[in-house]
Structure formats: structure tokens, C-alpha cells
Amino acid sequence: MPVLCLIRHGESLWNKENRFTGWVDVPLTDKGREQAKRAGEILKSLNIKFDIAYTSLLSRAIETLEIIIKTLGYNIPVIKDISLNERHYGDLQGLNKDKVAEIYGKEQVRLWRRSLKVRPPNGESLEDTQKRTIPFFERAIKGDLELNKNVLVVAHGNSLRSIVSYIENLNEEQILNLEIEPAVPILYDYDINSKKFYNKRILKI
């Protein structure tokens, strides 16, 4: 049975500063690099051989993947695609989340960050993000799983939320409460015959 592994990048500089990041290209912190290394160590302990890896065009995801591959100790073909970029936070990008909450209220910020359909000003909703992530997921990532390949995906909180909510067929309330932690591997087995994902594992240690 092929395996799909989803991993959010490690802590970035703007994660540490509690700022909306979106498509702004900011680096990992030292903590983020350590988180990525730990994710690689966890995967190495499982003895899963990944056949292909996918990531976004943003350096925090790319570097996380590079650290994981180095820790695994073998080469994996890597495909980088804009479809896996974080959702675009529009006018919120670069702003401190607490300060935005002081202006607009915590509930409005929660809806901007976690709901399916509410867009931040001049930005993408999660539903908008799904319109680019899911076709790519179906075509490329699921296409590789259909070929019995083990697939590693390193991306972003919301690009991965869009994929997880699709895989698990979550409703809007479940999506609102869905969190993806930095550098914590999420694994699914994929049944080629039934076309279904099952046996979800979140490998937090």
C-alpha cells in the first residue's frame, strides 16, 4: 500500500514574530530547522522509502524538505509547484496577528485564518486555495500514489489544511477547528483499488 506523508514547514521568522506570512518568502528560524530535522528522524525510524517529494515555491517549505531529505539519507526527486504555496493573505501579509485582532476582533481574525469561505481583504479564502491545491493533488500527487509510489509533501498550514479537509471530507465546522502543526508528519495509507485514504497517523513526539 502506498503512503502519503504531509508535513508543514518548520517555524519561520514570521511565525516566531506572529505575523501573517502568506506568499511573502521568509526563512526558517533555527528552531524551524531543528523541527525539520526531527521530522526527518521520525520518518527515518519508520523505514519508509519515499519515491517522490512535492513542495511549494517558498523557501521555508523548500528548506524544510531539504533538511528532511538530508536526514533521511537518500535522494528523492523533488517537484516544486506554486499550487502548493500558502494561501495568499492579501492586505494582512506582514501584519502582527494580535494587532490585527485588536482592530477587527478575535472572531473576525479566526474566520479569516480558519474558515472555509471568508476571505481576508484582497486575499484568498481556504476555498480559493483549494481551487489550486486540489486539482494539483488529484493530477500529480494522487497520480503518483496510483502508481504505487510513496509520496512526501512539504507545504504550508493552509495549503495542507485544504488537502486534509478534502481527503477527509470535512464539513465547515470541522475545517474551522483543523490545525496543522509545524514539522509534524501526517501519514495516510492509500488503497489503489478503493481510491480511499485510511489509517491516518499524526507522528508528534
Q: Which residues fall in each region the model found?
A:
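Extended, charge-rich low-complexity interaction segments
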Residues: 107-123
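Phosphate-coordination/substrate-recognition cap region in phosphate-metabolizing enzymes
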Residues: 38-110, 167-189
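Short, solvent-exposed aromatic-acidic interface loops
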Residues: 200-205
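Short, well-ordered beta-to-alpha junction loops that form the rim of enzyme active sites
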Residues: 55-58, 83, 114, 149-150, ...
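Active-site-adjacent alpha-helix immediately C-terminal to a catalytic or transition-state-stabilizing loop
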Residues: 4, 62, 75, 135-197
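Loop-to-helix element that buttresses phosphate recognition and phosphoryl-transfer chemistry
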Residues: 5, 11-63, 120-135, 176-177, ...
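Short coil-to-beta-strand
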Residues: 2-11, 106-110
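Short linear capping/connector segments at secondary-structure termini
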Residues: 19-22, 81-85, 114-118
